[in-house]
Amino acid sequence: MADMAPARALALVLLAVAVGSALMAAAQDAPSPPTPMAPSPSTDETPPVWLKAHATFYGGADASGTMGGACGYVDLYSQGYGTRNAALSTALFNDGASCGQCYKIACDRKRAPQWCKPGVTVTVTATNFCPPNWNLPSDNGGWCNPPRPHFDMAQPAWEKIGIYRAGIIPVMYQRVPCVKKGGVRFTINGHDYFNLVLVTNVATTGSIKSMDIMGSNSTDWMPMVRNWGANWHSLSYLTGQMLSFRVTNMDGQTLVFRNIVPSGWKFGQTFASKLQFK
């Protein structure tokens, strides 16, 4: 029995070595844990897209000829739009739904380096409509003919990016948020049973998707209809009542301007709110 002890001990050692080798091999064959992935960069901000168009100018050196227009802003100076404005072709005007939108524009030096001022852009507000001219071809005078995207800019704005002698320049443009001071403003025109409300000084999208009105004698909102440009109308009799507006911009943000118009209002008055789209 004593002679068998060394042999048994040797056998146990060999067994332990074999088991250890098997465990190491199994560990090597097992799949390794996944390597932690680095977080992907945020895709919340989409790079701005630049689109091609052309631009001409009108209105004179002081832009006085751009007053009025198909959006209904009348005096662009007093409304805060100034000389940084443009008339849009049919492809961009969208039957007036684009009124108030803002566009950053740069002269396209790749297409016309001799007529571009380098390294500058200008931001303009859509305040007018550039009608088509069917008597002229789209590439020779009929610049605003569909489906061409075209900006007929106020001359001072155009001259920020282009050389005057060119007359027309190729441009790159993109929609940008509108920056405004103060709140949204409402100007009431029309007459009894026809309330025509001009909405101005709209920030962010610059334009309005839908609008409702409510008189102080009711608790029901009544939808308004875009009449032309930035003017919305209601056929209800609201004279002598305080007026509230519910306005939704093109991004879907809704603001309620409750009793923004006092009961003693008159046609032709403008009422400035303290609320603004963000």
From Swiss-Prot:
Pfam families: DPBB_1 (PF03330), Expansin_C (PF01357). Its main location: secreted. Glycans are attached at residue 217. InterPro entries: Expan_Lol_pI, Expansin, Expansin/allergen_DPBB_dom, Expansin_CBD, Expansin_CBD_sf, RlpA-like_DPBB, RlpA-like_sf. It is a peripheral membrane protein. Keywords: Cell wall, Cell wall biogenesis/degradation, Glycoprotein, Membrane, Secreted, Signal. GO terms for biological process: plant-type cell wall loosening. Expressed in roots. Residues 1-27 form the signal peptide. Residues 68-183 form the Expansin-like EG45 domain. The keyword Glycoprotein applies. Residues 193-273 form the Expansin-like CBD domain. The keyword Glycoprotein applies. It comes from the Eukaryota. It is found in: Secreted, Cell wall; Membrane. One of its GO terms (cellular component) is membrane. Coiled coil: none annotated. Belongs to the expansin family. Expansin A subfamily. May cause loosening and extension of plant cell walls by disrupting non-covalent bonding between cellulose microfibrils and matrix glucans. No enzymatic activity has been found. May be required for rapid internodal elongation in deepwater rice during submergence. This is Expansin-A24. It comes from Oryza sativa subsp. japonica. The gene is EXPA24.
